[in-house]
Amino acid sequence: EQALSVAKKYHLNLSSSAQELLQQETPKSLNNVTTQITGSVRELCAAAATACWSLGYEPIVLTDQLCCEAREAGSFLGSIVRTHIGQGKKIAFIAGGETVVHLTGKGLGGRNQELALAAAPALSGLNHCCVFSVGSDGTDGPTDAAGGYVDGQTETDLHAVGIDVFLTLADNDAYHALQAVDGLIITGATGTNVNDVAVALVE
């Protein structure tokens, strides 16, 4: 009934087979069905934390509910790196969720690539740190990359090939910028999708 009322409200022309299907009563219970959650963004962050721990980093999960502009998230992770670098501790800051990109340009990229690239200016000139962000499904935007990686050398390397980070972000062209400095992360399709994970590593 609800689906039919929505179709009527928006004057949707449904096929006769669709109308017939929607007129059937929705089953109230399915006794032979079991639902089990086998993965989530929270588990993704926990797995990332375990991996970082195995590499000697103290993992800190900042959130598994990240939901903001990709550029803002990248800048924020970059600022966290600047705050904690040089303290003699190996720390991994982990953020899971899904950011958004409001398109202002005509470039190529995805939210994870844009997040990573936006962190590059904050990391510029620093040693022993990086930020990377990936989609758990292995794809990021309309590209073959899962995400991107930047470190303290990235912005310098971009300048060396004539690429300005801020102009690139304004054109939403993170893919080509990261490609130029070997900063794309390409995994291929993973067969799952539990949002994205971004990590800032500091020593």
Task: Tell me what each language-model feature is.
Residues 89-90, 94-130:
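C-terminal structural cap/anchor segments
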